[in-house]
């Protein structure tokens, strides 16, 4: 394991061309405007029960598409519950049904988790360039402000920077008294360098 980020960036769009997935994408993309105008609940309440279905993704077991849908629906669900003048007590079946299905498949509760908010919610502005604070943006957000995006993209970069430490720690766990001391030192130095890079990124959080 090198990092908690996927080896390739998360999907920004569904490969499967189903109307329900287009509906999910449209609502997720519109969340900043829907929240600003207090129209999230109105938008969702007009939908029929299966208009946000993810059954095709579960049937195909398309992992990256499933992660994208989990992120989309998590944002939509939280926006519905908390985006009005007062918190909603009931989440409509049109959201809860597909959300719970995805949650059961992934083995985690239906909530906007760190995975859906950060690990599966980024892309590189320039695909040819490495992950950096100047080259990472969010797929989904609530209001789309600088503070919201910056807080999450910093965590993406931290996860990337910590990758060498995770890799070195794993290699250290495989060493024993028969290994050369240089093997230990090399990996310990990698951990130190990695953590210094992580702390440097952390220091930019207030910016």
What kind of feature is each model-predicted range?
Residues 155-169, 195:
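Hydrophobic faces of stable alpha-helices that mediate helix-helix packing
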Residues 185-207:
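Extended amphipathic alpha-helical segments with heptad-repeat/coiled-coil character used for oligomerization
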Residues 35-46:
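Charge-rich, low-complexity segments
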Residues 57-65, 146-157, 180-190:
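Non-transmembrane, amphipathic alpha-helical segments
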Residues 46-139:
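Long, charged all-alpha helical bundle/coiled-coil segments in cytosolic proteins
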Residues 1-35:
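Intrinsically disordered, low-structural-confidence terminal and linker regions
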Residues 84, 169, 173-180, 199-206:
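Long, hydrophobic, amphipathic alpha-helical segments used as structural scaffolds
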Residues 134-152, 168-175, 179, 186:
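Short, charged/polar, low-complexity loop and linker segments
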């Amino acid at each position: 394991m090198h990092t908690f980020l996927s080896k390739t960036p998360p999907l920004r769009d569904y490969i499967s061309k189903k109307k329900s997935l287009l509906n999910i994408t449209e609502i997720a993309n519109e969340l900043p405007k829907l929240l600003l105008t207090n129209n999230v609940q109105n938008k969702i309440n007009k939908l029929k029960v299966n208009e946000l279905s993810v059954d095709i993704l579960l049937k195909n077991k398309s992992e990256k598409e499933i992660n994208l849908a989990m992120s989309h629906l998590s944002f939509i669900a939280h926006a519905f519950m908390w985006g009005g003048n007062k918190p909603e007590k009931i989440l409509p079946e049109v959201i809860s049904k597909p959300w719970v299905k995805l949650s059961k498949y992934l083995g985690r509760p239906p909530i906007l988790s760190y995975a859906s908010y950060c690990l599966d919610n980024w892309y590189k502005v320039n695909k040819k360039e490495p992950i950096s604070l100047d080259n990472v943006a969010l797929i989904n957000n609530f209001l789309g402000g600088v503070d919201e995006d910056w807080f999450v993209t910093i965590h993406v970069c931290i996860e990337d920077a910590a990758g060498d430490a995770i890799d070195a720690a794993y290699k250290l766990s495989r060493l024993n008294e028969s290994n050369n001391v240089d093997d230990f030192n090399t990996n310990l130095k990698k951990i130190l360098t990695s953590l210094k890079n992580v702390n440097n990124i952390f220091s930019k959080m207030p910016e």
